[in-house]
């Protein structure tokens, strides 16, 4: 008996969508990757460029697709969005993107898809909440990429400070994927030791009292620096999305800081932001709650307030 194919549909064939498709194809996590775009010829070109590398990849079926691919997809990854036009305000751009994302979300829901919707388009927290509302799905099945990449940047930055492999740094960036995000230092550890304790032995490059504010600033601003250098970010984004997709397709129950609409967790409700979640086949299956210290709880609440205000303004 044939096993069910693990299928991912990518909506939006631009730099982020195509880089994700490329990284996913190399990972071996998916058996089928459909690439869709408003510009069908562009999607065809991206798919053709990828399939010609199939002799170098794990077995995978890559093709250009359309809305009919949603129905049997395990994950639909939405990277589509409008670019800001000259003279267009931030809120007008947000409204245009919300219209695009809600339209896609409705199409996915109406297709009968039983999988997970992963929103990547920015501002990801607001658009994920809009997509959830449009879809009518349960909240764990409509998630955003959130601060998974920000968390990777945080771990990388700390690895330079501590002289330890980034994969052995444990910690999270939480809240908004944006300027109000914060580092959950209370959750940050190396080899089971709190980061402050680990660095107190003088093993970190800045000594026992490293500059936490400077590290957070570096994490927050890293995307801006890359944009200054090359115009946009997509390599690390593609890898972060592949990590999330792998957790879903392989039912890993990994703990990732995806963006999810909260329903009382951390004392917050009706807001979508990044917190540690168990991610498996059905999406974000559970939020991992913890008692945050007062300053981190205040930062989370400030992030939630900012996002709620933006969502209200958009509507």
Curated annotation (Swiss-Prot):
Which Gene3D superfamilies does the protein's record reference? Lactate dehydrogenase/glycoside hydrolase, family 4, C-terminal, NAD(P)-binding Rossmann-like Domain
What are this entry's molecular-function GO terms?
A: L-lactate dehydrogenase activity
Q: How is its activity regulated?
A: Allosterically activated by fructose 1,6-bisphosphate (FBP).
Whether Cytoplasm counts among this entry's keywords is yes
Which of this chain's residues are annotated to bind substrate?
84, 90, 122-125, 150-153, 233
Pathway the protein takes part in:
Fermentation; pyruvate fermentation to lactate; (S)-lactate from pyruvate: step 1/1
- Where does the protein end up? Cytoplasm
Q: Does the keyword NAD apply?
A: yes
Q: Which residues carry this modification: Phosphotyrosine?
A: 224
Task: Give binding positions for NAD(+).
Answer: 16, 37, 81-82, 120-122, 145
Q: Which residues catalyse the reaction?
A: 177
Q: What is its EC number?
A: 1.1.1.27
A cellular component term (GO) from this record?
A: cytoplasm
InterPro entries to which the protein is assigned, alphabetical: L-lactate/malate_DH, L-lactate_DH, L-lactate_DH_AS, Lactate/malate_DH_C, Lactate/malate_DH_N, Lactate_DH/Glyco_Ohase_4_C, NAD(P)-bd_dom_sf
State the family named in the UniProt similarity comment for this chain: Belongs to the LDH/MDH superfamily. LDH family.
**Task performed by this protein:** Catalyzes the conversion of lactate to pyruvate.
Assembly and oligomerization: Homotetramer.
- Put simply, this protein is called L-lactate dehydrogenase
| Naturally occurring in which organism (per UniProt) | Treponema denticola (strain ATCC 35405 / DSM 14222 / CIP 103919 / JCM 8153 / KCTC 15104)
